[in-house]
């Protein structure tokens, strides 16, 4: 008499690249020793090629300290950083009519939008008034879109010349593309700028709560952060900085030297934002922000810097240990498929959640 059954065993997964062998052995049936040990074991090989890709969102805001409505932009920055500390980057371009002081202007940051102030864009996909609720919703929506490229960068001062910065950016695409049209771009931002007062439409709570500005006067002392100091290819990207043909997980390195403008007040407060422009869509595919350090120090935001969950395939479906967000599965050519009954092959898994978003490549054998 022959009896068969199916059951699942949850495995912790494998870490590291290479071949891994998992062996399962049946030791008892209904609490009794297995009388026939000729078929009580099975072995499966797992090929670990997992690469994590951290998606970061770039918010470009166009504003000015004399704009009475800008407190909502400041509040948006603060709340987005609090909600998404590892996945949110802000750049504030001061260009409010004719009221922007020369010391806050950044003519080389030549990307701009038309509209009323303040206004902003997230990844050049969503454009909106930066009321915090709008900003949080659009940042979350951009994170859920994920990315096809990981990005990291390192920035150091040129030895004996604090007015120049060496920058090296590294991109890793998760999918091969022979007709890619991507370009690197860079910006320098400065935090901690003082000596300005913010016109405040929220003074006394007349327009509701706005990040504490309701408790300040109609002209409030502020510290300006994320201020755009200079841009390098920010509008169209740097031509030929990324080849037309890209291979999956093959690092693409681009190095350049950035000249700092005279408006920079404190070199200890500057950061470099590197981002990748998708020329086909006119959007920003990914971004990273790093502090500028002295030569020999390290300030790098790694492609794999954000911890990502272990991935496993259980019962033909992808599961992620400890991750409570949404898992989406794609074939290697980018087609989304149902997360069930996965056969042998190579897949790309995208996880999107409130606190984390990631992309991993897996091989099911």
Q: Where are the language model's segments positioned?
A:
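Local sequence-structure signature of Cys/Sec-based thiol-disulfide redox active-site neighborhoods
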Residues: 51-88
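C-terminal tail/sorting-segment detector
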Residues: 344-365
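Intrinsically disordered, low-complexity Pro/Gly/Ser/Thr-rich segments with frequent PxxP/GP/PP motifs
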Residues: 1-16
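Short glycine/proline/serine/threonine-rich loop/turn segments at secondary-structure transition edges
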Residues: 13-23, 262-270
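Short, conserved sequence motifs used for protein processing/export or organelle targeting and
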Residues: 29-36, 86-296
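Residue-level detector of functionally pivotal "anchor" positions at catalytic/ligand-binding pockets or at interdomain
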Residues: 49-57, 291-325
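Terminal processing/anchoring signals of secreted or surface-associated proteins
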Residues: 67, 120, 297-304, 316, ...
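Short beta-strand elements
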Residues: 36-53, 283-297, 362-364
């Amino acid at each position: 008499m022959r009896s068969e059954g199916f059951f699942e065993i949850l495995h912790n997964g494998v870490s590291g690249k290479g071949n891994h062998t998992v062996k399962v052995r049946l030791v008892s049936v209904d609490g009794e020793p297995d009388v026939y040990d000729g078929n009580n074991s099975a072995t499966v090989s797992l090929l670990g090629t997992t690469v994590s890709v951290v998606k970061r969102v770039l918010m470009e805001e166009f504003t000015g300290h004399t704009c009475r409505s800008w407190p909502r932009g400041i509040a948006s920055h603060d709340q987005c950083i609090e909600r998404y500390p590892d996945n949110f980057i802000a750049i504030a371009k001061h260009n409010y009519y004719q009221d922007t002081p020369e010391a806050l202007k950044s003519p080389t940051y030549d990307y701009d939008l038309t509209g009323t102030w303040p206004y902003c864009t997230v990844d050049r996909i969503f454009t909106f008034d930066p009321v915090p609720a709008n900003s949080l919703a659009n940042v979350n929506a951009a994170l859920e879109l994920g990315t096809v490229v990981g990005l990291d960068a390192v920035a150091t001062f040129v030895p004996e010349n604090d007015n120049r910065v060496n920058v090296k950016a590294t991109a890793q695409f998760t999918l091969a593309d022979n007709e890619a049209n991507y370009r690197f771009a860079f910006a320098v931002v400065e935090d901690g700028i003082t000596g300005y007062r913010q016109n405040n439409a929220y003074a006394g709570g007349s327009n509701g709560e706005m990040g504490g500005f309701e408790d300040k006067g109609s002209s409030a002392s502020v510290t300006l952060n994320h201020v755009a100091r200079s841009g390098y290819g920010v509008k169209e990207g740097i031509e030929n900085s990324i080849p037309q043909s890209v291979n999956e997980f093959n690092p693409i390195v681009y190095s350049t030297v950035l000249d700092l403008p005279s408006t920079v007040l404190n070199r200890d407060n500057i950061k470099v934002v590197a981002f990748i422009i998708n020329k086909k869509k006119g959007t920003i595919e990914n971004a990273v922000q790093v502090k500028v350090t002295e030569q020999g120090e390290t300030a790098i935001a790694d492609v794999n810097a954000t911890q990502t969950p272990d991935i496993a395939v259980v019962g033909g479906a992808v599961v992620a240990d400890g991750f409570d967000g949404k898992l989406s599965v794609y074939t290697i050519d980018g087609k989304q498929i149902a997360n069930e009954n996965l056969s042998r092959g190579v897949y790309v898994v995208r996880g999107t959640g409130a606190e984390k978003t990631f992309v991993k490549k897996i091989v099911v054998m």
